[in-house]
Amino acid sequence: AAVAPAAAAPPGGKLETLEHAFLECPAVLPAIMWLERLWHRMGGTIPPRTAPTWLLGATGPWASRGRALVTWHVLRLTLLSTAWDLRCRRHRTGQQFQPDQLIAALVERLQRRVFADWQRVGSTMVDLSGACLSWFPDQPCPFWTHEEFKARWCTNNVVAMVAPPPPGATGSGDKLLLRLTAASGAPPAGA
C-alpha cells in the first residue's frame, strides 16, 4: 500500500499546531476568553489555558466535580467543535472568520443545546422516540428532572432561567427563558 506524502508546510512557514489552532489563533482566542468569563459567571473556576485542559479535557485543582464538570466539558467541546467547523469552512471557501462570528456561532449552538435539554425535562424515551410503552416494563424515568436542568443551565441565571407560569395561567407549566447572548461572556463594562 502506498503511503501518503507528509503534508507540506505553508510557503515560508511551519505547520500549524492544534494548540495554536484552538487556543492561540487570533480568531479563536477571544472566544476562549469569552467562554472563560461565561464559566466564571456560572460559578466555575477559570481553568488554565493549556492544551491538556482545553483540548484533552484534563482536570486539576481548578475543576468542579460532578455535574458542574460535565457542564464545563459541554461548553468546552461546543467551543472546539464550533471553531473546527469555521476553520473547515475557511479551508473550503477561503473566507476567514472573525472572533465575533465564532462567538455568535457558539452562542447559537449553546442555545440549541439548552433548548434540547429543556425538551428532555420530564420526558421519557417513550415520549421522545415514539416507542411503545409496552417495550418498557418498568415505568421509564425522565431523561432530566427540573433540578438537573437547573443545576446545569440555570446557575446564577446566566445561560437560562426557568420561570413559573403566572398566577391563574393555564398551560404546560414552567417556561424556559434563554438568557445566553454574546454579551453573556463579554468583559465587564470598563474592563
Locations of the language-model features?
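Family-specific functional microsites
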Residues: 1-191
